[in-house]
Amino acid sequence: MAKILIVDDSKTSRRFLKDMLASAGHEVVAEALNGQEGIDKYFEYMPDLVTMDITMPGKDGITALTEIIERDSKAKIIMVTAAGQKSNMIEALKRGASDFIQKPFEANIIIDVIKKVLEE
């Protein structure tokens, strides 16, 4: 299945996503705690897909998304965040996010979205 990078400052969220993705047959190749670390690990591991939080210390998810897309326009990045204001969703999609999921969510939702994004 897919090689995935998780970018989220919440240890609980990273663990939840990692367990859920593993149970669906995906491999989490790396985890990052903030946007800059996410950018660095993206270009180190070149994953098939990234799940990215928006609100993180240091470089936020929207900035990291923008920097990754500028360097790799084919990057598949799903924003997975509690910061679910419509303005965040619109901004992320305008800057190249593949999709947007608001926390909390059910496991089947993210698995279905990942499948859809990978097939695009």
Which sequence ranges carry the predicted segments?
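Short, conserved "switch-loop" micro-motifs in signal-transduction and mechanochemical regulators
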Residues: 83-84
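Acidic catalytic/metal-coordinating carboxylates
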Residues: 34-37, 60-63
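Receiver (REC) domain active-site loop signature in two-component systems and cognate sites
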Residues: 56
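Two-component/phosphorelay signaling modules centered on CheY-like receiver
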Residues: 11-30
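C-terminal output helix
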Residues: 105-114
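Active-site beta3 strand of CheY-like receiver
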Residues: 45-51
